[in-house]
């Protein structure tokens, strides 16, 4: 058996052992809670969570031929998904226990005894994936609805033809739907169906459902009554997005933990839609989910992009630094950027200092007329025609690539001269140093592009800070003509942002990300390698997930 397969089997054995130990600890925590020992239960739950997190961190060697270890691979995926499901429930139980413990500390003993008796009758089944929600608290009974009660109430409401309910459809697309079993098996539920994200407004006996968001999919194979519903509840519903376009939702109504549903947006029925438009549509859906679920959408990386090991003896120091930048950006992207306004403020404060340290060009750099024309056309069209939004979205990338490719040789040439003059480097040493710096810059661009995935308010902030500050720097260094070109490019981004408010497949985040990424890629294109690819093929156990790409078509 090949070495890679042996490494995987060794990791698989470690996952099984860690899984058994973690679930034993979970059982202990549950027993403490059932015995009404909240302090001991909290400690036990916290230890169980740490054990689960340690299991997710186990390095797994990727086998070259997965068919030879298919059964073990499927079992490993199933174990990891069971742990992920358990992790969600453990965090919920910890939240409940800590809240109860705090209320006990802050209230009289007599009152706490009464509330404890009530909680015993209302407590949801432990680890049964049916948590209580905030919906229904204002009702006469005062009892919050569980997730399953919400789902059942929605189905009952939609089945009443004369119900006075307002359903606002926020999003619609064609999707393929999959069922993911706890065992790791994946089956197709619907080859193609219409999916909508809907907000419900209703009164009367259904008042507890007012304000709830839910996803519904038509099920052509199930007859007229075939509608799949999935309530979206902040802090309760978890959503995962894979990097190949699937959105995965845990099955909250199934008694067996670890089951899930997968949705993948498709172009079926809309053959005129391009891959870029489909990608923008996915991004828009992701933005909506993040807004509805208060940011609890987890990005899942596929094994091929999670290769962690780096062969340090076969790459240059600059490339190692570049790879580390990319790796770090992948890790922090989903959690890093919450204060984009601070970035804009920093740029505003730092621009005068940067300009003061730069020597302006002796003469304006000449920009090719074709580039100027493309930017001018983009400006005019974005100001005049909202119907051309899709065309402009593509032209943003074209204009930014032109700016980046024009600036690249100037950056390296001027940097090399600076090293020779200021630090006494000879020509060869200076050029080599700048080449290393550009290689690092390639990683920085890739990292910045990755981190931009996490921005929530990118276009407004970037459209302002970039146009106000980057243009000043470019104009100071390379002259008025280049500054005008950059200004026009960023103005195009601003105009497209305004137009995009009425187009559901273009988002502020997508436009800004595309602009920044393509400009940077052009600057460092000659130095950029496949920074995620390495000689080692390891991923963390927490990245294992059934691969829906096999069912994509």
Curated annotation (Swiss-Prot):
Residues 105-130 are annotated as: Disordered. It comes from the Eukaryota. Keywords: Cell membrane, Cell projection, Developmental protein, Endosome, Lipid droplet, Membrane, Neurodegeneration, Neurogenesis, Synapse. It holds the Pfam family Senescence. It is found in: Presynaptic cell membrane; Early endosome; Lipid droplet. GO terms for molecular function: small GTPase binding. Residues 325-509 form the Senescence domain. Disruption phenotype: Mutant larvae show an overgrowth of the third-instar NMJ, with an overall bouton number and satellite bouton number increase of 40% and 90%, respectively, compared with wild type. Mutant larvae also show a decrease in the amplitude of evoked excitatory junction currents (EJCs), but normal spontaneous miniature EJCs (mEJCs) and axonal transport. Adult mutants display reduced locomotor activity and progressive vacuolization in the brain, which is associated with neurodegeneration. Residues 15-96 form the MIT domain. Residues 113-123 have a biased composition (Basic and acidic residues). InterPro entries: MIT_dom (IPR007330), Senescence/spartin_C (IPR009686), Spartin-like (IPR045036). Expressed in larval brain, ventral nerve cord and neuropil (at protein level). One of its GO terms (cellular component) is presynaptic membrane. Interacts with Eps-15 (via C-terminal region); the interaction is required for spartin localization to the NMJ presynaptic membrane. This is Protein spartin. It comes from Drosophila melanogaster. The gene is spartin.
